[in-house]
Amino acid sequence: MKNLLKMSDLSPAELTHILDVADQLKAQQKLGGTAPLLAGKTVALMFSKASTRTRTSFEVGVYQLGGLGNYMNTAELQAGRGEPLKDTARVLGRYYDCVVWRTYRQSDLEEFAELAGVPVINGLTDYAHPCQVLADLMTIRERRGSLAGRKLCFVGDGSSMANSLIVGGLLAGMQVTCVCPQSYRPAVDVLMFAHKYGSAFHLTADPAEGVQDADVVATAVWNTAKPGTPESEQRLRDFVGYQLTGKLLESAKPDVMVLHCLPAHRGEEISSAVFEQHAPEIFDEAENRLHVQKAVLAILLAGK
């Protein structure tokens, strides 16, 4: 693994190795701390979008591993005033041992990684959110003991979370169902990847069909538009029936896990009652962002 830009960068063995290392680092941290695997290493934390969990978990994770993490808002860099992306990449690659970047276009991230000359980690693009999906899979494995053969259902917008969860779930040997309105389907290349897995993948617009006998149901914010705008009102109409409610989940497994990458819009993609009922696994999922990201850093920078 040279970078982590999208889930399809990983082989099944590499995915399992990341989760195994994350388990080890989490256990060590609970016992008092991890070895300074990143001693003398520097990590640029470059953000073009607002962030709570990604920024703070990377800052804490780099510190816990003995490295130095520098946060930078791209609006405050020369890149925010027109400096070409390729120049920023070639400069930061000479200062830092690794770059984490949260940005909009996946193509920008891919170009940056080609030029930086150091490992680059996707902190979220409009196409992919691999760090979050690694945390999701870690949480499922912790609570269920295995991933292979379990039914994972995603309900919502077929954007970054759906794209990454489909690929990650299939790489882990899960049965994956994606439930989304017809006009909010996942990326074409993701669907092409998924269809190679045959009956292990199912795409539907029917939430009741999708959650049937699911072991895990995941969702994410689907009303990403500014409240009160025409786009927001359109999304509210388009996603009627796609809220995770107690009634919808009645057809899932009795011990179904519910995951949400946060932030949650209660009353939109998930009801308040379902969110609070499943808060323990949702906040384990949030904590595990820290541990899987530490694992990725340790593998990329310390040969773990």
Stretches found by the model and what they are:
Residues 48-60, 142-220:
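Glycine-rich phosphate/diphosphate-binding loop of Rossmann-like nucleotide-binding domains
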Residues 42-43, 47-95:
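Active-site cofactor/substrate anionic-group-binding motifs, chiefly glycine-
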Residues 255-256, 261-304:
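Adenosine-phosphate binding glycine-rich loop
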Residues 90, 97-168, 260:
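Anion-binding alpha/beta catalytic cores of soluble intermediary-metabolism enzymes, centered on
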Residues 195-273:
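Rossmann-like adenosine-cofactor binding region
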Residues 65, 95, 115-117, 172, ...:
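Short, structured coil segments at secondary-structure junctions
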Residues 1-56, 60:
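Positively charged, low-complexity intrinsically disordered leader regions
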